[in-house]
């Protein structure tokens, strides 16, 4: 913890960014404790949220009430590829909520395949991204680990990046999943040269084996500062590459999700947030 605090002295003045939270983290609380959960996030000190469409009707009014700004939202891949009518609905919903970044959160197993599948996906993403830009919004892609595994000699990651226009598809980089796939988040952030506009922040337990599947042990997920990732270096690279928004996220928590994000918030505060 002392190392976190010391690093914060060097990093704090450079970022000046508000810290957000991905509401997927509190999905289990929304059915019965939505109001107190959103209020708790505001009391912790979060200023921004990233939403997911399935719970927007419940959480968006509460975010407005408690002063949490929705800046990004997860919309299912099926909406993104259903142009133009299906995707226009995503644009309309985002604009109504004040969301700037429409994020593709996940590619379901049934939508994965060989290189041609990802080339077709990239074409649809380019079309959706163009519609986004015309509406004053930004389309982003959130990666997991599978994108870094080879399929017929090619990585989906490389296909998606090379076949899409950086102006129409930015990235939401999840540092946990980058590390699970055996890559260095710091190097990847820098290699992307500013294409990563959003960052998901969560830590990884020591000793988690390299893999391209999302089927990791729940114990692999750790709060920021309680795992093996080098967050001072990650945040320095992100600041240098002008990442625009940062979101704490925990796919799985050992206990209370609110307590989990509180821990990450406090440790990130020591790094200058």
Task: State each model region's role.
Residues 1-13:
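N-terminal export signals
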Residues 6-8, 48, 78-170, 191, ...:
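Active-site acidic/histidine proton-transfer and metal-coordination neighborhood
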Residues 14-16, 38-43, 56-72, 86-99, ...:
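Acidic (Asp/Glu)-rich catalytic clusters
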Residues 14-32, 37, 44-48:
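Boundary/entry segment of secreted carbohydrate-active catalytic domains
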Residues 17-22, 49-51, 70-75, 102-104, ...:
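Hydrophobic faces of well-ordered beta-strands that scaffold small-molecule active sites
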Residues 21, 41, 49, 63, ...:
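Conserved, mostly hydrophobic/aromatic
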Residues 27-32, 48-60, 77-85, 109-113, ...:
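Acidic-and-aromatic substrate-binding clefts and catalytic sites of carbohydrate-active enzymes
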Residues 133-228:
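Acidic/histidine-rich catalytic cores of soluble enzymes
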């Amino acid at each position: 913890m002392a190392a976190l605090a010391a690093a914060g002295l060097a990093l704090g003045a450079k970022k000046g960014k508000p810290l957000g939270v991905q509401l997927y983290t509190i999905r289990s609380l929304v059915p019965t404790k939505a109001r107190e959960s959103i209020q708790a996030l505001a009391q912790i000190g979060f200023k921004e949220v990233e939403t997911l469409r399935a719970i927007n009707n419940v959480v968006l009014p509460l975010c407005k009430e408690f002063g949490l700004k929705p800046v990004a939202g997860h919309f299912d891949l099926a909406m993104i590829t259903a142009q133009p009518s299906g995707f226009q609905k995503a644009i309309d919903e985002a604009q109504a909520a004040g969301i700037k970044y429409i994020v593709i959160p996940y590619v379901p197993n049934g939508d994965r395949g060989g290189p041609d599948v990802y080339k077709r996906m990239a074409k649809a993403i380019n079309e959706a991204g163009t519609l986004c830009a015309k509406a004053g919004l930004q389309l982003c892609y959130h990666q997991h680990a599978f994108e870094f595994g080879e399929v017929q000699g090619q990585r989906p990651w490389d296909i998606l990046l090379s076949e899409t226009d950086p102006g129409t598809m930015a990235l939401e980089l999840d540092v946990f999943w980058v590390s699970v796939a055996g890559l260095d988040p710091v190097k990847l952030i820098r290699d992307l040269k500013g294409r990563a506009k959003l960052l998901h922040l969560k830590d990884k337990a020591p000793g988690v084996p390299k893999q391209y599947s999302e089927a990791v042990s729940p114990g692999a997920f750790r709060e920021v500062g309680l795992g093996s990732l080098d967050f001072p270096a990650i945040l320095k690279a992100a600041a240098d590459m002008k990442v625009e928004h940062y979101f704490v996220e925990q796919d799985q928590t050992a206990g209370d999700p609110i307590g989990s994000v509180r821990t990450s918030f406090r440790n990130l505060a020591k790094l200058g947030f």
